[in-house]
């Protein structure tokens, strides 16, 4: 893609294309110092800048970080946020991550005081500075009222039950004729955080969105003021789902469904009051990343985990099992649960005498797709963490809606057993032989051609896209789109409309040798054959002069009948012609904007399972992905054509 008017400035790591292995040869500390100098020399987004306070030094925190944390967070091939990105966070956000969030497994080795020291060392701020979050301004009484006449029009995160992410033109209100009229209407920023992974829901005149610091906001759709806010226990990274009601029915009690890292919640959509919460799995490394899926009176949630993220020889690896749990949506009563692997058994001992367990893994990273006609759901699974491997890892699986029984399995990659011990070179923790880590991160799509034919589409980190028969699980076609890899291929970007499949590829260089070139970009395939309709590859040129910039598409896509809407990892929001791939409109999400609270903020890359949401001529965009080497940000942008 083009540089799109940006001035020409070389970006270290990006412009020079330093390989991961070369980065290690340079030395991680020296590399981070160079990145820090170059990064801070440029204007950082105001939304993610820490308040100007007297910096503090915490030597005890430095010692703890060096001993327990640096190996991952100072590894340039890791997805773990670098110390630079962690330094932007609010100190209480780091403490929460170590206590209740994704790092709670590592945090078990730390006392409450130790966690505070680590947070203060990284942020150079005291835990009690009182500057952790700047909430959007509260609505006036007239703007706070829930609008029962404005019913939700999307079924959930996947927009349709089949996860097509297809918004009809009449609902989107956005076409090739008016897309050039898009202009920023308002923006909300959330200080002290560095990413937004929660795809918003819209209903009742509100935008509902979750934040990294665990707050669910109800924002007035027209003004951006906060109607209410709800504190969850940890980061909200899932999409938000709202139950339907009849237009104008003020007796209705619509509920919101979402998950933080370990709990599923149901809230009253009008007031934000908690109706129920459930902890779906007692495994200590459980991590909820898939948006809940609401179908009729049942709520489905996939189970993923952080168990593959590395541990020690003293940890009994591995025992987590991926799966799906079904709840009665109004009460939270569990209806059934179905696992992707059998219960683990002891498989011997490791070098220090710790029990080894298997099978494990086959996590469900993204939302299930619902097949109304066949009364089944489809999930994608990840790799196994320990040997022996199973026939359900790296698979698309069909389950019966009524009881979760597995109806068929299509396994795309056999014998993929992997954990981050392989990434760090910890051979005693890495399964032998080492698998390629080719998860299905993108949610499966049940796509319907204009002829009426149904195909289940799966997209994998291997770079392959698959067309599968929904009745039998038999492969119809497969197409290699990206090079793939541990951090590459297709992560979340998969959508379909009419006879086309749209795929976003990130293809980040993970340091592994490959004869294939990286192929980040946007691609369109024929739904029935898998053949290319068009290709829109990205270029490294788009990153010249941009800090923490990597070309490609990591986040989920949204499509209309005419257009493909893609938030890119280089910080640009782009809208393409669905028929040709031609660029119709673009916006630099890293540019500073004035928020409804009066402050200055900006976004960054887009990543994870979030996507832009078009509705009634508006476009709602959560932006910022402070992970690994992606640009941080924490802003919701709302554009309008009117």
Predicted regions and their residues:
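Electrostatic cytochrome c docking/interface patches
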Residues: 46-64, 135, 142-143
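Blade/loop signatures of beta-propeller domains
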Residues: 138-184, 340, 345
């Amino acid at each position: 893609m083009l540089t799109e008017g940006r001035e020409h400035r070389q970006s270290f790591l990006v412009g020079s294309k330093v390989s991961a292995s070369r980065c290690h040869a340079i030395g991680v500390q020296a590399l981070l110092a160079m990145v820090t100098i170059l990064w801070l020399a440029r204007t950082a987004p105001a939304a993610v800048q820490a308040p100007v306070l007297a910096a503090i030094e915490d030597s005890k925190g430095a010692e703890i970080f060096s001993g327990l944390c640096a190996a991952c967070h100072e590894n340039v091939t890791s997805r773990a946020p670098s110390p630079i990105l962690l330094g932007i966070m609010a100190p209480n956000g780091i403490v929460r991550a170590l206590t209740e969030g994704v790092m709670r497994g590592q945090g078990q080795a730390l006392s409450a005081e130790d966690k505070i020291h680590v947070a203060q060392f990284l942020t150079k701020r005291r835990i009690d500075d009182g500057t952790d979050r700047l909430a959007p301004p509260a609505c006036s009484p007239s703007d706070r009222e829930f609008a029962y006449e404005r019913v939700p029009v999307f079924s959930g995160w996947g927009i349709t039950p089949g996860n097509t992410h297809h918004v009809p033109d009449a609902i989107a209100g956005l076409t090739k004729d008016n897309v050039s009229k898009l202009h920023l209407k308002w923006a909300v920023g959330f200080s002290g955080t560095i990413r937004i992974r929660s795809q918003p829901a819209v209903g009742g005149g509100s935008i509902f969105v979750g934040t990294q610091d665990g707050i669910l906001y109800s924002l007035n759709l027209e003004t951006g003021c906060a109607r209410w806010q709800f504190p969850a226990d940890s980061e909200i990274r899932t999409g938000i789902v709202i139950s339907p009601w009849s237009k104008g029915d003020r007796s209705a009690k619509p509920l919101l469904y979402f998950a933080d890292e370990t709990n599923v919640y149901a809230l009253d959509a009008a007031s934000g009051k908690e109706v129920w919460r459930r902890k779906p799995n007692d495994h200590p490394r459980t991590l909820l990343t898939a948006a809940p899926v609401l179908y009729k009176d049942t709520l489905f949630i996939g189970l993923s985990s952080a168990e593959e993220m590395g541990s020690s020889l003293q940890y009994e690896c591995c025992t987590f099992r991926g799966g799906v749990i079904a709840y009665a949506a109004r009460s939270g009563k569990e209806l059934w649960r179905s696992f992707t692997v059998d219960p683990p058994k002891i498989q011997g001992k490791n070098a220090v005498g710790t029990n080894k367990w298997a099978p494990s893994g086959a996590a469900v990273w993204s939302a299930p797709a619902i097949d109304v006609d066949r009364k089944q759901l489809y999930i994608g699974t990840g790799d196994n963490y320990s040997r022996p491997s199973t026939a359900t890892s790296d698979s698309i699986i069909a389950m019966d809606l009524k009881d979760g029984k597995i109806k068929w399995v299509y396994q795309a990659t056999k014998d993929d057993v992997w954990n981050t011990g392989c990434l760090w070179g910890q051979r005693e923790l890495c399964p032998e032989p080492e698998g390629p880590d080719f998860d299905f991160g993108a949610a499966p799509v049940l796509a319907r051609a204009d002829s009426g034919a149904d195909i289940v589409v799966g997209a994998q980190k291997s770079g392959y896209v698959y067309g599968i028969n929904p009745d039998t699980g038999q492969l119809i076609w497969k197409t290699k789109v990206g090079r793939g890899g541990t951090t590459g291929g297709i992560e979340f970007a998969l959508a379909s409309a009419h006879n086309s499949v749209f795929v976003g590829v990130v293809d980040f260089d993970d340091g592994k040798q490959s004869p294939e070139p990286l192929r980040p970009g946007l691609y369109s395939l024929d739904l029935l054959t898998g053949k290319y309709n068009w290709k829109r590859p990205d270029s490294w040129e788009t990153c010249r002069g941009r800090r923490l910039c990597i070309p490609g598409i990591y986040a989920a896509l949204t499509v209309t009948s005419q257009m493909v809407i893609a938030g890119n990892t280089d910080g640009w929001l782009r809208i393409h012609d669905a028929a040709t791939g031609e660029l119709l409109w673009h916006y630099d999400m890293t540019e500073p904007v004035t928020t409804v609270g009066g402050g200055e903020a900006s976004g960054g890359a887009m990543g994870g399972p979030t996507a832009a949401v078009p509705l009634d001529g508006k476009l709602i965009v959560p932006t910022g992905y402070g992970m690994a080497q992606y640009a941080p940000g924490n802003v919701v942008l709302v554009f309008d054509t009117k």
